[in-house]
């Protein structure tokens, strides 16, 4: 956990005179204890070791057999779980978030539940209804974690749609949406009306059982957003695989039609756009223009993307075109274009357009802060930044100290719930974990400074 010390920080942001680039040299690491620095360094080095990531679940099972559940669990809590997870109980989560808030950072809670593609078919709605209850509790917890009791304040929360509906249904809807002319039967307006009224929805591409599940899924989504709106919690819907995303985007559009209207106070439902996909810029541009024409608020979380290896392997096995950018440089260029598009949208539409720059890349963060200054976007306004809990703290802390709105994505739950989730995220984010070498250098440097009195810092690059 981050050291619980109250620090002085600027809420006004950068000077209005000339733009000063942020320095990500690890200077803000002085806010962390030696124990926190040591654990972060060890865990990040472990996570950069490919065999641990590849065989994580098998290694966890082996450690339980060898050491027993209690000792194995204690080791995980002292290492990976303690680094990346807020805790299991509401009190543990509050304690973690308080420490983040003391450092100028904000919580973005995530329920670590999702349905993997092609997982076993679930009988009935019980599993999804249980996840609905967890999501509603997360909304309440997110609201309760606001730094001030101001009733007009807003919290943010992540939402995995595949915790509330079957991935098989998502694939079925995706194939239907992609068929020219047939997608009108599943328009966002029709789905929004079905959510609001609760009336039966007839869809020709689905059988009776699938239609019943779609109806139940729409009801669950509606209940989550309705409760989040009442509690003033904005929902950031996660993007997933390309085989699911068109269906997820359709449902986000339906929710936006109902909850992102101009009289609702900004976007309550945001979509996530993955810059590593070739078509992302055009989709983002089209969606932004469509929202503007319809008078809807527009919320975007912009990420590079986490499913690169799986997307390429799926395309190879199916003999289809690879949907991803050819290399990291192309992905970075795509991210930069999408970022410029959205910052321009924010400058034109003001509070009707919100953006989270969800990136661990220092260049992308610098580009965002510079363009915000050039466009006159306040640092604590409709643009915020996001990084994972336990990673990229040298960027998060520098942003927070400069007065920018910075969120840490925070999973919480029991070891049994969270460790498989963390291992899946690690497998999807191999490049991010391998790319954390600079953060490891900065952590090592701060430890040397503390223990040996060496004051040199790694130069920014």
Swiss-Prot record:
Gene Ontology molecular function, alphabetical: FAD binding; oxidoreductase activity, acting on the CH-NH group of donors; proline dehydrogenase activity
Pathway assignment: Amino-acid degradation; L-proline degradation into L-glutamate; L-glutamate from L-proline: step 1/2
Enzyme Commission no: 1.5.5.3, 1.5.5.2
Cofactor: FAD
A Pfam family hit: Pro_dh
Keyword Membrane: no
Catalytic reaction list: trans-4-hydroxy-L-proline + a quinone = (3R,5S)-1-pyrroline-3-hydroxy-5-carboxylate + a quinol + H(+); L-proline + a quinone = (S)-1-pyrroline-5-carboxylate + a quinol + H(+)
BP-aspect Gene Ontology terms: proline catabolic process to glutamate
Cellular component aspect of the GO annotation: mitochondrion
UniProt keyword terms in alphabetical order: Acetylation, FAD, Flavoprotein, Oxidoreductase, Proline metabolism
Leading EC class: oxidoreductase
N6-acetyllysine modified-residue sites: 310
Function: Dehydrogenase that converts trans-4-L-hydroxyproline to delta-1-pyrroline-3-hydroxy-5-carboxylate (Hyp) using ubiquinone-10 as the terminal electron acceptor. Can also use proline as a substrate but with a very much lower efficiency. Does not react with other diastereomers of Hyp: trans-4-D-hydroxyproline and cis-4-L-hydroxyproline. Ubiquininone analogs such as menadione, duroquinone and ubiquinone-1 react more efficiently than oxygen as the terminal electron acceptor during catalysis.
Protein family according to the UniProt entry: Belongs to the proline oxidase family.
Protein name as it appears in the record: Hydroxyproline dehydrogenase
Organism of this sequence: Bos taurus
